[in-house]
Amino acid sequence: MAVKIKLTRLGKIRNAQYRVVIADSRTRRDGRAIETIGKYHPKEEPSLIDIDSERAQYWLSVGAQPTEPVEALLKITGDWQKFKGLPGTEGTLRVKEAKPTKLELFQAALAQAENEPVAEAITPKKKKAAKADEAKAEDTAADAEAPAADAEAADK
């Protein structure tokens, strides 16, 4: 029985995700697999490539033939070079940066809040309101002067 290492497709339309499987060469693409040894998500940035190196080495040693896409993945992870005895067994796999945990984000926010100066709870009045207050003050002053002028005129 000829055994191949190939990809089976999973996922939604336009969001392909693959599993790296060991299967009989005569089975269809998504057919029955002997063993699943990894996964490949090409749409993520950087692409997620997770292959069980020990199982891949075993299946390559017993004669399983990788398809062209799987061979390219094995070269990226360094498993193909290890099997062939070539230099560069560390591979060229890029790893996604780890996201900070919620606890780390919370601690950072607390530290930032402690370092900031305390702000006033009351916001200053807008400039338009200040101009309106000045206009009202002038009107009240003018109104106060008018009765005083009337009183002086009446006294004379």
Curated annotation (Swiss-Prot):
For the keyword Ribosomal protein, the answer is yes
Compositionally biased tracts (Low complexity): 143-156
One cellular component term (GO) for this entry is: small ribosomal subunit
Give the transmembrane ranges: none
> Has keyword Amino-acid biosynthesis?
no
Which cysteine-cysteine pairs are annotated as disulfide bonds in the entry? Answer: none
Biased composition of type Basic and acidic residues is found at: 130-139
Gene Ontology BP annotations: translation
| Chain residue ranges for the region called Disordered | 114-156
Q: Gene3D superfamilies, per this entry?
A: 3.30.1320.10
What's one GO MF term for it? structural constituent of ribosome
Q: Which UniProt keywords apply?
A: Ribonucleoprotein, Ribosomal protein
Instruction: Identify its protein family.
Output: Belongs to the bacterial ribosomal protein bS16 family.
Q: What name does this protein carry?
A: Small ribosomal subunit protein bS16
Name of the gene encoding the protein in the UniProt record: rpsP
